Amino acid sequence: MFEFEITSNCSNTKARTGIFHTPNGKVNTPKFMPVGTMATVKGISSKQLTSTGSEMILSNTFHLHLQPGEKLVKESGGIHNFMNWSKPILTDSGGYQVFSLAKLNNISDKGVEFKNPRDGSHVFLSPEKVIKIQMDLGSDVAMAFDHCPPHTANENDIEDSLQRTHSWLEKCIETHQKSNQALFGIVQGGKYPRLREYSAKFTSSFDLPGIAVGGVSVGEAVEDIHSVINYVPKFLPINKPRYLMGIGSLREISLAVANGFDIFDCVLPTRLGRHGTAFLNDERLNLRNARFKNDFSPIDKTCKCETCKSYSRAYLHHLIRNDEILGLTLISLHNIAHLLRFTNAISTAIKDNCFTNDFAPWKTSSIAHHTW
């Protein structure tokens, strides 16, 4: 039911193209996943999301457990029916909230007790409970519960959290009983090569349908991010999809693909879009800026998204300056389409044998310019 088919390999790097087959369709890799934390990509309908070329989205177990609750989602027919999205969905386990809500939680080997950010009530999540929630949600891919420590933690504390992550993975595997849902394990270990190697080998030993690398882009130096991207893949199985969590910048995606990663997610396209910032190649345009008031060109003349085909920078500037909801929708749509266009261009470049780890196809001097 779940199969990862490698369709081409790059002769210059470790990049590859592939197809990840799921019960709700296939994902052509490398591929960016838009983030729909609450079973919605903020401000965008499922139909609009389809128009961007999105093939898989991410939702969050922790937040959906709090509201509306997994039982209601299951009663609706599962998360696909609930949000009217027929393509693959991956649910994050809530491990990131162990990091982001650190001041509101208490961690033990059994799980994490959270203070509900909505009403202050106490919520306990164990690895077993996290898996049961995801089984009720009915996502295509469930993530194992992991402990994502802050990047400032010392090596001993990182190692302690790693042992917890590995113990939780074993409990997740024991609990997971859903044949039409894949379970991915998560590699942790901070910036320490010894711990990353240990975690990658441990996680790989279970022969799961896919493997993720977490604890990246959580405030650490760019050099540390690149070190993990360069180092970890050599310890991961070649025949499984590799998911690099929380990465959405073009430079890091390009470097990650060059090292053999396949799937990526990030909130930046919609977070920046909601504040009026649009992607243009490797630039970011703040459309709130007065210089766009009389600019009647699209965000990107080469982009075929609905926003660029239909609206000018001047109109988007007007919407954002007047806090019109349509503005955040249109810019978010473009930003998502831009990242998907980028990963699609990478795929073409790999197949045409012109991909490099500093991929920038919008430059006319690039040998991969035809992919853009």
Curated annotation (Swiss-Prot):
**Span list, region RNA binding:** 246-252, 270-274
Q: Name one GO biological process term.
A: queuosine biosynthetic process
* Catalysed reaction equations from the record: 7-aminomethyl-7-carbaguanine + guanosine(34) in tRNA = 7-aminomethyl-7-carbaguanosine(34) in tRNA + guanine
Q: How is the cofactor bound?
A: Binds 1 zinc ion per subunit.
**This protein's UniProt keywords:** Glycosyltransferase, Metal-binding, Queuosine biosynthesis, Transferase, tRNA processing, Zinc
Residues at which Zn(2+) binds: 303, 305, 308, 334
Give GO terms: molecular function aspect only: metal ion binding; tRNA-guanosine(34) queuine transglycosylase activity
- EC numbers: 2.4.2.29
Q: In which pathway does it act?
A: tRNA modification; tRNA-queuosine biosynthesis
**Gene Ontology CC: one annotated term:** cytosol
**Which InterPro entries does its entry note?**
ArchSynthase1/Queuine_TRR, TGT, TGT-like_sf, tRNA_ribo_trans-like
The active site annotation covers: 92 (proton acceptor), 265 (nucleophile)
Cofactor section = Zn(2+)
Is-annotated flag, keyword Disulfide bond? no
Keyword match Nucleus: no
One Pfam family of this chain? TGT
Q: Which positions does UniProt annotate for substrate binding?
A: 92-96, 146, 188, 215
- Self-association and partners: Homodimer. Within each dimer, one monomer is responsible for RNA recognition and catalysis, while the other monomer binds to the replacement base PreQ1.
Q: What does this protein do?
A: Catalyzes the base-exchange of a guanine (G) residue with the queuine precursor 7-aminomethyl-7-deazaguanine (PreQ1) at position 34 (anticodon wobble position) in tRNAs with GU(N) anticodons (tRNA-Asp, -Asn, -His and -Tyr). Catalysis occurs through a double-displacement mechanism. The nucleophile active site attacks the C1' of nucleotide 34 to detach the guanine base from the RNA, forming a covalent enzyme-RNA intermediate. The proton acceptor active site deprotonates the incoming PreQ1, allowing a nucleophilic attack on the C1' of the ribose to form the product.
PANTHER family from the entry? QUEUINE TRNA-RIBOSYLTRANSFERASE
Which family is annotated? Belongs to the queuine tRNA-ribosyltransferase family.
- The protein's name is Queuine tRNA-ribosyltransferase
Per the UniProt entry, what species is this protein from, by scientific name? Prochlorococcus marinus (strain MIT 9215)
Q: Which gene encodes it?
A: tgt
